[in-house]
Amino acid sequence: MTITTTGLTRAAGLSAAAAGLIFIAVQINHPPMDATSVATTEWVVRNSAKVLMGALALVGITGMYLRQVRQAGLLGLIGYLLFGAGYLLMFSTEVISAYVLPGLVDLAPGYVNDILVAAAGGTPVGDIGAMATVLAVTGIGYMVGGLIFGIALFRARILARWAAVLLSVGTIGTASLALLPESFNRPMAVPVGIALIGLGISLWRDQRSPADAIPQKHAVQTASIEHASV
């Protein structure tokens, strides 16, 4: 098996698309964000899917950046670092949510509820320590990084520009959740999921084009040589 840059980039595209699909899927019929839900098997399964989503998204956006590192410039680098940091921290918090919080439900239900409140953008009653900072930085990286990275992708003119716009609008639009009812929390994730799917497919298709063009070019050259020899 030969590992090539094209193959890795196409894999990154598929990873981004898969991350987008999971991001949308986990929002459907999401259980309430409280200690009672954390104690269920569904919570572990759903948040395990979010852990996978975070890992796939990191692979995907890395592939997007490397594909257009020259065209994206400094703005692209800043956006990638912020957005990547946001997803890395999101991956970490989902690991905690899936595998640590369930073990704390019986011991410290109030602490678990406070973390969930903070994760949803609310103000916890008690002290949750460093988790408050982690969640805040995660939100900043996700929103600001997504905005800048989407703008850089749009300006680079390589991947689907509509998806780049949707990524910017969807991520920074998350800030509006502080003013909107809780019922908007899940639907607001859908635009970002669609953007990741669009960008991922665009990256995958972009890597198919050069390979598909080579046989055609070779065929034209062969036909020209045969015609000249007649």
Question: Each predicted region: which residue ranges?
Answer:
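Hydrophobic, aromatic-enriched alpha-helical segments typical of multi-pass transmembrane helices
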Residues: M1-V230
